[in-house]
Design a protein with these regions (language model features):
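P-loop NTP-binding/switch modules centered on Walker-like glycine-rich loops
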Residues: 177, 181, 185-266
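The feature captures the beta-strand-to-loop junction immediately N-terminal to the Walker
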Residues: 40-42
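Conserved ABC transporter NBD signature motif
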Residues: 63-75
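Short catalytic/signature loops enriched in Gly
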Residues: 4, 142-146, 236-334
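Conserved ABC ATPase "signature" region
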Residues: 74-75, 127-146, 255-256
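A short, proline-enriched helix->beta-strand linker immediately N-terminal to the Walker B motif
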Residues: 170-174
């Protein structure tokens, strides 16, 4: 891989309070220019925390962030306030999971997009409004001129998400962070948004980190996938290789539990149990209590993330590369 646009090394996030929670631990990954990296995992695995950390959105008084985040040669975690403001929205932008909460309800869609443009580019109000209209047309919102004057609550969920994409791309970012952008949408609209995101990514050449708990959505959009569990990356590989031969037992379980893998007349595969409590001290592999292949070493010794070219794996007892598409039933201990 050529020099990465984004390089994350040893990233850790701990939320402080009555109970200290280790939300991220020793996270490493790179994103090249023009590449789409999928972050995949269950709720609570650290995907959204990763994105918010990349934008510096955590309250410093209640959050301890460690490690390094290097974006295009800059140390993001040490940026002063003004440089961080220019970085957010200008060079790196984010699509939030629920656009209804991300938009200000008392301003029109057009006003909010134009304001973002003027905050990062030296243009007048007329030019900013024209660019806002262009962005709404670009994300295929019908009657874009009329929608420019609409308030967020006047748009459907799918329209609001398209408007959110327009806002995120208005300043031509080098990296787009997409935090489960289709979760709140119906199946038909989900497909439309996924296709739109991929089309815009290819058209602009920007890099993207696509967060999802839906492995099917991640496969459609991403070039590579990093699988997260309990605040750590446990496996990373190119999409085709990850799907054809998952090495980590958690990855195999996610693949096996999709509807596409189901056999008629048989129940859907599941991963028994639940993710661990991240406020409690942890020994060994966090997935060990749910893993059929776990042995004593798995429970007592944390497996490091070992990289081999574009692949990475953290497992003491990985699946053989010829194991196929993953188990067809529960993969946890009986």
């Amino acid at each position: 891989m050529s020099r990465a646009l984004l390089s994350v090394r040893g990233l850790g996030v701990r939320f402080l309070g009555e109970r200290s929670v280790a939300a991220l631990s020793d996270v490493d990954f790179d994103v090249a220019r023009g590449e789409v990296l999928g972050l995949l995992g269950e709720s609570g695995s650290g995907k959204s925390v990763t994105l918010r950390t990349l934008l510096g959105l955590h309250a410093p008084r209640t959050t301890r962030v460690t490690g390094q985040v290097n974006f295009d040669g800059e140390d993001v975690l040490s940026l002063p306030a003004e440089a961080l403001r220019r970085y957010r929205g200008g060079r790196v932008s984010m699509i939030f999971q629920e656009p209804g909460l991300a938009f200000d309800p008392v301003y029109t869609i057009g006003a909010q997009i134009a304001e973002s443009i003027r905050a990062h580019d030296a243009v007048d109000a007329r030019t900013a409004t024209a660019r806002a209209l262009e962005m709404l047309e670009r994300v295929q919102i019908p009657q874009a001129g009329r929608r420019l004057q609409a308030y967020p609550h006047e748009l459907s969920g799918g329209m609001r998400q398209r408007a959110m994409i327009a806002l995120a791309l208005a300043c031509r970012p080098l990296l787009l962070l997409a935090d489960e952008p289709t979760t709140a949408l119906d199946a038909t609209v989900q497909i439309q948004i996924l296709l739109l995101l991929r089309e815009l990514q290819r058209e602009t050449g920007m890099a993207m980190i696509f967060v999802s708990h839906d492995i099917g959505a991640a496969i459609e959009v991403a070039d590579r996938i990093a699988v997260m569990y309990a605040g750590r990356i446990v496996e990373e590989n190119a999409v085709a290789e990850l799907v054809a031969a998952p090495r980590h037992h958690y990855t195999a379980g996610l693949l096996a539990s999709t509807v596409g893998e189901a056999e008629r007349g048989r129940p859907l595969a599941t991963i028994p149990g639940a993710p661990p409590d991240l406020s409690a001290p942890m020994q060994g592999c966090a997935f060990a209590p749910r893993c059929v292949a776990a042995v004593e070493r798995c429970r007592s010794e944390l497996p490091p993330l070992v990289r081999d070219g574009a692949r990475a794996l953290a497992c003491w007892r990985p699946r053989a590369t010829g194991d196929g598409d993953g188990p067809r039933g529960p993969i946890g201990p009986s």
